[in-house]
Curated annotation (Swiss-Prot):
Residues 438-490, 501-520, 527-553, 600-621 are annotated as: Disordered. It comes from Oryza sativa subsp. japonica. This is Probable serine/threonine-protein kinase WNK2. Keywords: ATP-binding, Kinase, Nucleotide-binding, Serine/threonine-protein kinase, Transferase. It catalyses: L-seryl-[protein] + ATP = O-phospho-L-seryl-[protein] + ADP + H(+); L-threonyl-[protein] + ATP = O-phospho-L-threonyl-[protein] + ADP + H(+). Belongs to the protein kinase superfamily. Ser/Thr protein kinase family. WNK subfamily. Residues 28-286 form the Protein kinase domain. It comes from the Eukaryota. One of its GO terms (cellular component) is cytoplasm. The gene is WNK2. ATP binds at residues 108-111, 158.
Length: 621
């Protein structure tokens, strides 16, 4: 009687047999289906030579090919796939035509975690850093495809065609069976793709590789919102109408993080304004934290002693609790992530390192708007983020910096430092931005800031009483200037937790900060008592408030009114002169850009501005 075989052999005997073998007998296909699309079915398979599990992709030729031209096109694309070698492009091993069964088969690497869409649905809590890593990998693959001559266009990029190895955090672009090579005119002439991810120019049948950037933006939108783009539409015709009309998916408005939203908007912008994959890879949004620049500021030590000084609500989007949101800006230990000896850009004071450190980043939204991000970290490693748009036509660095100082409990001297950093960021995008503008307008902004505080007091009081919109723990509030911001620390809670700032000497300070109990005629603003101008001190003609530094200052109302009116007239005239000069500069630029194709003007202007800024910096002693 033969001996009983070990259990391991029984398991081997139960292994499924190959349903099909390739002509070389190297690859065997199982019946297990890994995925299925409109034209293609993906089976689990095995490479007997290397001992690897692989994916067997099978396309029914009769389903998509009607003539020899179509067949030759697919053959050429399959041959193309064999030449693609990149870490973020799916590996292609072999292919052949099965005339008997009317199939085209090709073997690719298999992925343990399925598609990016499946992976994202499975893992609900993903940090924004992970999304950035995925984005960098996808864009890296697109850079490789688009750098071919002529470029390779995917034309059907979506989360269902991006694959994941979850144990390595690795993503790769796949399903390149629909890719095409651009002709000599560098444009394609066929509509192929998924409507939700198709750029407007695809419908016009005149497009280039930038359609993949649009699709990438829609992929990122789906990853952030868990919604298919244009899910509000019930059919492809409705999607086509919205896309043709320039209407963005409704899910875009649901994104709370303004940085994420603006980055997606860059990707799905009009073709003439859309950035390339290489340009997007260099975008500040995707930059590693190690590339950030840190500016130490002299902190208000009196204010920092307050119990809640590191948790105050500051700016338009504030992330305090790093564990409270699934997709968020990481605010972990600042000391561990960003050693100050490597990243400090400039130092105002030898003791500055013991105070707050601020990171300044910027993104150009359009010709008139720059999105600024300030990250403030204290000596304990706690960090706070402020996001706000800067309108180069309406805002000045001094006005924004003055408001920030009040919100952040910094010293009055820090106004100039913050303004200079804002100016530096703006000049990175607009080299001819007038540095002296902030100095010239400083007096005007300071004078008006007092009036604005007085006039806006009633308005902000009403806003505080209104039911605020709440989403994911963030409460929408308003600054005195009218700007909106979002905070997970409602204003009234902060007012109760912060101690008021005391001046270093007795009496009224020049910046209007009073000692506690010096007067009851103050309004608490994020822990800082700000002296509001007395209505009688506001000139009725000019509306400019004068803040007295001593009881005897400006006793003569006529002198005050005369000085105020003359000063306002002068500042208004200077501002108009700057506006005229800015308009002239803009017109001069437009004249030169007429020699550049319209779809390349924005890209050319941005590139030349950066070069001009580099030249200006190199010319400085």
């Amino acid at each position: 009687m033969p001996p009983t075989p070990p259990p391991e052999l029984d398991l081997l005997d139960t292994e499924p047999e190959f349903a099909e073998v390739d002509p070389t007998a190297r690859y065997g296909r199982y019946t297990e289906v890994l995925g299925k699309g409109a034209f293609k079915t993906v089976y689990k398979a095995f490479d007997q030579l290397e001992g690897l599990e692989v994916a067997w992709n099978q396309i029914k030729v009769g389903d998509i090919l009607r003539n020899n031209d179509d067949l030759e096109r697919l053959r050429s694309e399959v041959r193309l796939l064999k030449t693609l070698k990149h870490k973020n492009i799916i590996k292609f091993y072999n292919s052949w035509l099965d005339k008997k069964n009317n199939n085209i088969n090709f073997i690719t690497e298999v992925f343990t975690s399925g598609t990016l869409r499946q992976y994202r649905i499975k893992h609900k809590k993903v940090d924004v850093r992970a999304l950035k890593k995925w984005s960098r990998q996808i864009l890296s693959g697109l850079v490789y495809l688009h750098s071919h001559d002529p470029p390779v266009i995917h034309r059907d990029l979506k989360c269902d065609n991006i694959f994941v190895n979850g144990n390595q955090g690795e993503v790769k672009i796949g399903d390149l069976g629909l890719a095409t090579i651009l002709d000599n005119a560098r444009s394609a002439h066929s509509i192929i793709g998924t409507p939700e991810f198709m750029a407007p120019e695809l419908y016009d049948e005149e497009y280039n590789e930038l359609v993949d950037i649009y699709a990438f933006g829609m992929c990122l939108l789906e990853l952030v919102t868990f919604e298919y783009p244009y899910c509000e539409c019930s059919n492809a015709a409705q999607i086509y109408k919205k896309v043709s009309d320039g209407e963005k998916p409704s899910s875009l408005a649901k994104i709370e993080d303004p940085e994420v939203r603006f980055f997606i908007e860059k990707c799905i912008a009009k073709a003439s304004q859309r950035l390339s994959a290489q340009e997007l890879l260099m975008d500040p949004f995707l930059r590693d934290d190690g590339e950030k620049i840190f500016y130490p500021l002299q902190s208000n030590t009196k204010a920092s002693d307050g119990a809640g000084s590191s948790n105050s609500s500051m700016g338009y989007k504030y992330d305090r609790d790093a564990s409270s949101m699934a997709i968020r800006e990481h605010t972990g230990s600042f000391a561990e992530e960003h050693p100050s000896d490597r990243y400090i850009h400039s130092t105002m004071d030898p003791q500055a390192a013991a105070g707050r450190i601020i990171t300044v980043e910027s993104q150009m939204k359009d010709l008139n708007t720059i999105f600024l991000k300030l990250r403030i970290a204290d000596s304990t490693g706690h960090a706070q983020n402020i996001h706000f748009p800067f309108d180069i036509e309406a805002d000045t660095s001094i006005s924004v910096a003055t408001e920030m100082v009040v919100q952040l409990d910094l010293t009055d001297q820090d106004v100039t430092a913050i303004a200079e950093m804002i100016d530096a960021e703006i000049r990175a995008h607009i080299p001819d931005w007038a540095l002296e503008e902030s100095v010239e307008n400083q007096g005007d902004e300071r004078a008006h800031s007092e009036t604005d505080s007085s006039e806006a007091d009633d308005e902000t009081s009403e806003l505080r009483n209104e039911p605020n919109a709440t989403h994911n723990g963030f409460v929408q509030e308003h600054l005195p200037s009218g700007h909106k911001y979002w905070s997970d620390s409602p204003r009234r809670n902060i007012e109760m937790s912060h101690s008021a700032v005391e001046p270093h000497i007795g009496g009224n300070m020049p910046n209007g900060i009073l000692k506690k109990n010096d007067t009851d005629d103050t309004v608490s603003n994020l822990g800082t008592s700000v002296d509001l101008p007395n209505p009688s001190m506001i000139d009725r003609k000019s509306g400019v408030a004068s803040v007295s530094t001593s009881p005897q200052s400006f006793d003569d109302e006529h002198i005050e009114a005369d000085v105020s009116e003359r000063l306002v007239n002068l500042l208004a005239q200077q501002q108009e002169e700057l506006n005229v000069l800015r308009r002239k500069h803009k017109a001069d630029i437009e004249v030169i850009l007429k020699g550049v194709p319209e779809e390349h003007r924005e890209e050319t202007l941005t590139r030349c501005r950066l070069k001009a800024d580099e030249r200006n910096r190199s010319d400085k002693p």
